[in-house]
Regions:
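Core subunits and conserved enzymes of cellular information-processing
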Residues: 1-132
Length: 132
């Protein structure tokens, strides 16, 4: 049993990129689906597909690599808030990731949002992870 599904999600992507895989399968949940949509909109992954099965479903993510250097598009996936130590931020406390080059994913009262979306809507929430 996985005690931290978000950390598992990030670790599966990180390990697949380190191994040079093109596609990674991740057990689905609504939170992971929304995080995947954010990764796609921010340009960190090529495409994704949700597949239903008898259990919870699977998210298939096509990873993105630089065509010239073969380096992954995602340089770092960093879990911030964790089950043992939750990290919350007010709208004014949401900091930029890598001076605006990265993205923070937050779980807010208005759903799962990026740091820029949360600031624009003036909502704070739990800082799930930093991606750059």
């Amino acid at each position: 049993m996985v005690t931290d599904p978000i950390a598992d999600f990030l670790t599966r992507i990180r390990n697949a990129q380190m191994a040079g895989h093109r596609v990674v399968d991740i057990p689905a949940s609504n939170l992971k689906k929304r995080m995947t949509e954010i990764l796609y909109k921010q340009g960190y992954i090529l495409k994704y597909k949700f597949e239903e099965d008898n259990k919870q479903g699977v998210i298939k993510i096509a990873l993105k690599y630089n065509a010239d250097t073969k380096q992954p598009a995602i340089q770092s996936l960093e879990r911030v808030s964790r089950p043992g130590l939750r990290q919350y931020a007010k709208p004014a406390e949401i900091r930029r990731v890598k001076n605006g080059l990265g993205v923070a994913i937050l779980s807010t009262s208005k759903g799962v949002l990026t740091d820029k979306e949360a600031k624009a809507q003036n909502v704070g929430g739990e800082v799930l992870c930093y991606i750059y």
